[in-house]
Amino acid sequence: ETIAYEQSEKKSGSEIWVNIGIVDEPERQLQKKLELNLSTQNYMIIGSAQSGKTNLLQTIIRGVAENYTPQEVNLYIIDFGSMILRNYANLNHCGGVVCSDDDEKLKNLFKLLNKEINLRKEKLAEIGVSSFLAYKEAGKTDLPQIIVLIDNMTALKEMYLQDIDYLLPLFRDGIAVGMTFVVANLQTSGIGQRYLSNFEGRITLFCNDSSEYSM
């Protein structure tokens, strides 16, 4: 018997969507794409070791690269996990990959992202809009969506964010100006509620215990 393959909902041409899999609903005899809107919210991916967190980040990177141009989307990658993501350093969309031993490079990336947020706030104010989507819908194409992917948030926080918290302002202000964060981690504990409150999108892979993903 044929199973219906549901058509995707109509999407705004200003938004960045990526397909990460298929949802199977046997009781409805229905299959549909599982897609993430990377323009409207930050995403937190939680899962135990070997649960597929890095694979999911790679799926997102490839999905963006296959469906959007570098003029539409720029990627920045912070890999404090398996270091596999540095294989994407030469991707045309990728502005840089930072690993755990790249102290100066990481600081420069934080400065660049902070400067970009301030620049974009000024650009939006110039035409009287308060969101990046409104800026794009006004016909502006000079600014790409920026997506920052972080593998192993706990390690990043422990190694570099104890004295100066570079990330919290970026998490808080990014979405409104076209900067999205996709963060992968073993568990929510140790990240802190002030970080988690900026992630409306939450994806839970296999976890050994419910405490790993409880908020």
Per-range role (PLM):
Residues Q7-L133, A138-S211:
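P-loop NTPase catalytic phosphate-binding loop
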Residues E1, N208-M215:
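Conserved P-loop NTPase
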